[in-house]
Amino acid sequence: MTVRVAINGFGRIGRNVVRALYESGRRAEITVVAINELADAAGMAHLLKYDTSHGRFAWEVRHEREQLFVGDDVIRILHEQTLADLPWRELGVDVVLDCTGVYGNREHGEAHIAAGAKKVLFSHPGSNDLDATVVFGVNQNQLRAEHRIVSNASCTTNCIIPVIKLLDDAYGIESGTVTTIHSAMNDQQVIDAYHPDLRRTRAASQSIIPVDTKLAAGITRIFPQFNDRFEAIAVRVPTINVTAIDLSVTVKKPIKASEVNQLLQKAAQGAFHGIVDYTESPLVSIDFNHDPHSAIVDGTQTRVSGAHLIKTLVWCDNEWGFANRMLDTTLAMAAVGFRLDT
């Protein structure tokens, strides 16, 4: 069965989802039938073909009127501003990937379904009333056919949750803190300009900028047992892609740094292969650009203090890794089937 997908929002994640689909060789499993984006077709085709972070797309891309051609594949282009006007029923859409970053609550999901989609996957955490939040590699096996409106969590949640699970299963986490060192995003300013968040009024290329984060809430959504036991802060740095996460946890069992690294390396080679990677090479952020893993543990930065405090550094390509997980979760949602009577 080929899953018929529509993409709502063709920004950073939407375009990377299309690129990842073609580069990963999964076109026999997923076909993109339509993209809804307010920008014009010429701009959509240009930004799919040429990308500052990920380079030129290997596939031929062109557009004619309201059709986007990727190789021999034809994708219908839509410019609908209202979810109710989207022709998902006419197009036989199985799963909508909503990559707008704007929509994300149950009402929005129901609007996609009322328009004819069978299921919806949001590319950000969304509201708490969704049917499920998936971090692929950790909890996708909890998906059921009746889960129609699903969140793929966030790039940072996908990065840190597998590592937290591994450390908790092995040593028992008591509490933790997380610092996200995140590349600049398009909600920041190129030069100083007005923004409701006064820190984000400042030029993104000239400062390390603290921002709010809901990562602690994202952790407890997946692992409710950590409610009030994790805190998170975030800063944006003047790079355009790749994120590092500094994770510190206190654990019940005494441990050595070498044992932590052995655990994480074994997981990367085994149960979490393709989701978690492990390196001890002297790499910097750009070396992880276009890496499809959710998390890459930097073993050179693992530290243990007092036998119970573990500090690790985990990298991720916050665009490419997450786009690949969107595809994984889409297939997992389709694999459990569709119940249209719910």
Swiss-Prot record:
Q: Which cysteines are joined by disulfide bonds?
A: none
Active-site residues, record numbering mapped to chain = 155
Residues engaged in binding NAD(+): 12-13, 318
Give residues annotated as binding substrate.
Answer: 154-156, 200, 213-214, 236
Report the superkingdom from the record. Answer: Bacteria
EC number assigned by the record: 1.2.1.72
GO BP terms, alphabetized: glucose metabolic process; pyridoxal phosphate biosynthetic process; pyridoxine biosynthetic process
> Which residues bear the site annotation Activates thiol group during catalysis?
182
- Extract one GO cellular component term from the record: cytoplasm
Uppermost EC category? oxidoreductase
The record's GO molecular-function terms, alphabetically, read: erythrose-4-phosphate dehydrogenase activity; NAD binding; NADP binding
* Complex formation: Homotetramer.
Family as reported in the entry's similarity comment: Belongs to the glyceraldehyde-3-phosphate dehydrogenase family. Epd subfamily.
Q: What does this protein do?
A: Catalyzes the NAD-dependent conversion of D-erythrose 4-phosphate to 4-phosphoerythronate.
Any idea what this protein is called? D-erythrose-4-phosphate dehydrogenase
What is the species of this protein?
Salmonella arizonae (strain ATCC BAA-731 / CDC346-86 / RSK2980)
Q: What is the lineage of its organism?
A: Bacteria, Pseudomonadati, Pseudomonadota, Gammaproteobacteria, Enterobacterales
